[in-house]
Amino acid sequence: MASPSNSSTGLVSEFLLICFPNYQSWQRWLSLPFSLLFLLAMGANATLLITIWLDASLHEPMYYLLSLLSLLDIVLCLTVIPKVLAIFWFDLRSISFSACFLQMFIMNSFLTMESCTFMVMAYDRYVAICHPLRYPSIITDQFVSRAAIFVVARNALFSLPVPILSARLRYCDENIIKNCICTNLSVSKLSCDDITFNQLYQFVAGWTLLGSDLILIILSYSFILNAVLRIKAEGAMAKALSTCGSHFILILFFSTVLLVLVITNLARKRIPLDIPILLNILHHLIPPALNPVVYGVRTKEIKQGIQKLLRKL
């Protein structure tokens, strides 16, 4: 399908997003659970941010990291899900060239920053459980500030080139994206130019960043598990295993889905098209909806903070 001219990039000035090409009649039904998860994610993360901001007793490094995670989740949800729901409910499939690449930039940036934040939070739990006496001297406000700078700097170094490389390609005639989201490879495959370098860069950068984060997370939780198994009090051991186990499972889901998406995007002809589309959407809904529960609401201090907030209302 041709589109109006865009002098800076070729002929295409807008794209059409085709969600679930093989199951378009199901879109209204799919929108119901997606809408509920979106509302849950936004409400839970906003509540967590407000609670930590208003409660001075929660102004601690661990909760600053949790605030950063909630902020990343909110931005990711708002970047992707409203457009998906607009397609489902109102058939608003078109997206401008600039809006598509803006979505791609924010999505790539915040997903890699969230992966890095999970890694820093795993280290925080490692220090808290394996070296509790040294925790106040290691995990300080200065540590959180440096960690935040590292998260942003690493993202700028490795993730920023992804949308830039795609935006520099020429898009001549085809403008139909078989996805609900402007992912790098979904868009770049429409280009008239050779995209081998784009594919190679995303594969190498994705596996380097996400793979290294996942390895460090697994190492941190391995040390944590070893320390927890040495706890003699059965109640304390069970509580620690439950808490850290839920953290690790959620992180594993986040990282594994991202790595699977990198692979499926490079092997589209051998994998049903609707699978990566569904994984992309769920990846922007399930972790944001569960993070506040797993990391926040299950924490005694956060529960007390939310209760204080509700009493004020």
Predicted regions and their residues:
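Transmembrane helical core of 7TM receptor-like proteins
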Residues: 1-313
